[in-house]
Amino acid sequence: NTVRDVYTKTVKNGPYQVQIPSDGILRAYKRIQITSRVQGILKTIKPLFKSGQEYKLGQNIALIESSEYRANVIAQRASLYNLITSVLPDLELDFPQAYENWSLYLKKFNLEKPVPALPKMEDKVRLFVSGRGIISSYYSLQNLEKILTFYRIRAPFSGVLVQANVSEGSL
């Protein structure tokens, strides 16, 4: 009983696909319903918003026309910018230590980008700018900017669109 020949195969490590045949109803592990928090016309993007379309985590699923709302947000940014500009001379006279911070704040202010965080300020300066409506305008603007993000719907995880109840160009 001596073994004369032993046959071997060289194994190459890597991913192998295993198939397990089965019958029955297949249910998705994660199935969610995505709805829009804003109204508007659905824009055409690639890939098309159709049933069976695969999406990766963070990929745009749908874009809703936002040009009118975006223009409103930019107008509110300009309004905040004007409010701050109007109080700069008073800040320079009454609170010279705070003037530098607010001046730098205005230099990094860009109407096309989200509003930067307000500079650090003492209680007296906070009361002064609050009395001029700057703080309330700032937080209103932050709310508008948050709503602006709802015009872009992104995939919360990688998966497949099972059902689409709207099509491009519709409300």
Predicted regions and their residues:
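Periplasmic scaffold and linker elements that assemble and bridge Gram-negative envelope complexes
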Residues: 4-14, 27, 39, 43-44, ...
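Active-site-adjacent helical/loop segments in soluble small-molecule enzymes
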Residues: 24
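Conserved phosphate/oxyanion-binding catalytic-loop motifs
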Residues: 36
